[in-house]
Amino acid sequence: MTLNEKIREKLEEVDPLVFYGQAEKLDETVLWNYIVFFREKRSGSENRTSHTVTFHVAVVRENEIPEGLEETVIEKMLELPGMKLGSESTYAYTIKPGTGAAVEVLDIPFTKARKGR
């Protein structure tokens, strides 16, 4: 099983609607309550024998993200061997097109060291 498959499996324990990269076309009538994860960058070590991959998990909720959901997502991701929490989570806000509904997005970074170039 690939790392992306393992991440998806863990996140689906929190929310059944999980996307990789970006959310696919969602109908305006569907609640925007889902999770998206993606890779941001790959950084090599100084000795070039390993590298670190930075992942982001974006929790998207109409209106607001319930208290405790951030901690649940973090706990699930940290169950993956070698996964570490990044330094700073950020919140962003937007309006769902055609509805006027507020949408809150929480971006949580994680890193995973891997052997090899």
Name each model-derived stretch.
Residues 16-22, 79-90:
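Short secondary-structure junctions
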Residues 37-39, 81-83, 110:
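Aromatic-residue hotspot detector
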Residues 57-83:
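Mid-chain, well-packed structural core segment of small domains
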